[in-house]
Swiss-Prot record:
Location of the protein in the cell: Cell membrane
Keyword presence, Oxidoreductase: no
Membrane topology label: Multi-pass membrane protein
Organism: Drosophila melanogaster (Fruit fly)
Lineage, top ranks: Eukaryota, Metazoa, Ecdysozoa, Arthropoda, Hexapoda
Homology family: Belongs to the insect chemoreceptor superfamily. Gustatory receptor (GR) family. Gr57a subfamily.
A Gene Ontology molecular function term of the record: ligand-gated monoatomic ion channel activity
Gene that encodes the chain: Gr47b
Name the UniProt record assigns to this protein: Putative gustatory receptor 47b
Function: Probable gustatory receptor which mediates acceptance or avoidance behavior, depending on its substrates.
Extracellular-side segments: 27-40, 164-182, 271-291, 386-414
Length: 414
């Protein structure tokens, strides 16, 4: 793989999956083959895929509900609250998928420009620093093969959960279609999350490269060539900040919708698992699959927040090191002017990875999600205890009342 095709080599397969899932209408190619593009064929394919997945999933759910035998097998043993949880999950996975598609469609032009700038980024760096060696193989190993492994596990857990939830051998075709479409809908959350993480890591690695090159140039002899290269690194850091701002614009809303979906499904499944533990009933595979689902969503929330924090830390370190330019070349007016201009620019450009438009994506996001999840689970468990106490009180009251015989009319003579 040529170095000019590094972005496609690392992330091209992930973007192909986004297109196959119907999430985007963009197809990514190397610059020699025209670069990223969107045409009527990709749009038609995406619209067909979206319609097929959402309509087929909702149709299979309605089929299960309308058939008395299948409905009794799936929902007859569940409490009203757990039924509401499963209903919410069916609606939320479809709504989140639609939100993803609409958000990315609205940002399509911006997305195309972002991909084009990332494809051009490395080639421009090699023109000034030809000795730089990009480790594309490591990035591909981490994101493409990592996505395949996690995706295979998620597919296995989701399909197994649906088959175990149906609790009925009747309606196998509808069960297969429901399991397949549900898995595609829910896996879209993780797939887009991996692409978001990959681009954050792309920017983080370039900011680290700026620091490594600066350390070398700060120790070099004072010459015009050194100052020209340092000036390029200033521009390179600004381009990274611009890419980060564009990344937030393209993926910010989708990332917020994805984390909210992770929060809701983990809250619901953790409550169902807690209910099973409190009632001291024997476990069945359905709850094991729920626990594995929670583990996958936990993994996504943790690594997304972690990469957001690592990007923020790398950016701060890079900005701080650039601000030391005038200190290393104290006798140069060009260094002093460049540092002053950069400090002024830095005051007005404090980009960081965001969830939505206001929430910083950092380690604190993990606390925010799990603190909220714990609070809601505690409330639901308290509600479960209250329902159990009411039920026990009703049973006790029934045992305390003994009917001896029929009571006659009561008059004033009594």
């Amino acid at each position: 793989m040529q170095r000019d095709d590094g972005f496609v080599y690392c992330y091209g397969n992930l973007y192909s999956l986004l297109l196959y899932w119907g999430l985007v209408t963009i197809r990514v190619r190397s610059p020699d083959r025209g670069g990223a593009f969107s045409n009527r064929w990709t749009v038609c394919y995406a619209l067909f895929t979206r319609s097929f997945m959402v309509i087929c999933f909702m149709a299979t759910v309605m089929t299960k509900l309308r058939d008395p035998e299948m409905s009794a097998a799936m929902f007859g043993h569940l409490s009203p609250l757990v039924k509401a949880i499963f209903t919410w999950e069916c609606l939320s996975c479809s709504v989140t998928y639609i939100e993803y598609c609409l958000s990315l469609d609205l940002q399509k032009d911006r997305h195309l420009k972002l991909v084009a700038r990332m494809q051009e980024f490395d080639r421009s760096v090699l023109m000034v620093f030809p000795h730089v060696q990009w480790n594309y193989r490591r990035a591909r190993l981490k994101y493409w093969y990592g996505t395949v492994i996690v995706g295979f596990c998620f597919f296995s857990f989701s399909i197994s959960l649906i088959f175990d939830t149906t609790r009925c051998t009747c309606g196998i075709p509808s069960t297969l279609l429901m399991a397949f479409t549900y898995t595609l809908l829910t896996s879209s959350v993780g797939l887009l999350g991996f692409v978001h993480i990959g681009i954050m890591d792309f920017i983080r690695v370039r900011l680290r490269l700026v620091q490594q090159l600066l350390h070398q140039l700060y120790q070099a002899d004072d010459s015009s060539e050194v100052h020209e290269r340092i000036a390029y690194l200033f521009e390179m850091s600004k381009r990274c900040s611009f890419l980060l701002a564009e990344l937030n614009g393209v993926f910010g809303f989708a990332a917020a919708a994805g984390i909210f979906y992770d929060f809701t499904i983990m809250t619901c499944f953790v409550y169902v698992i807690c209910q099973k533990l409190l009632e001291r009933e024997p476990w069945d595979p359905e709850y094991v699959y729920m626990l594995l689902h929670v583990a996958i969503h936990t993994y996504k929330v943790v690594i997304t927040s972690t990469y957001g924090y690592l990007l923020l830390r790398e950016k701060r370190n890079c900005m701080h090191l650039l601000s030391q330019y005038s200190r290393y070349f104290s006798g140069q007016d060009v260094a002093r002017r460049k540092t002053e201009d950069f400090q002024h620019w830095r005051m007005h450009n404090r980009q960081a990875a965001m969830v939505g438009s206001t929430t910083l994506l950092s380690v604190s996001t993990i606390y925010l999600v799990y603190n909220g999840m714990a609070n809601y689970v505690i409330i639901l468990v308290q509600l479960l205890f209250q329902q159990q106490q009411i039920k026990d009180h009703q049973l006790t009251s029934g045992k305390d009342v003994d009917i001896v015989g029929p009571m006659g009319p009561i008059t004033h003579m009594d």
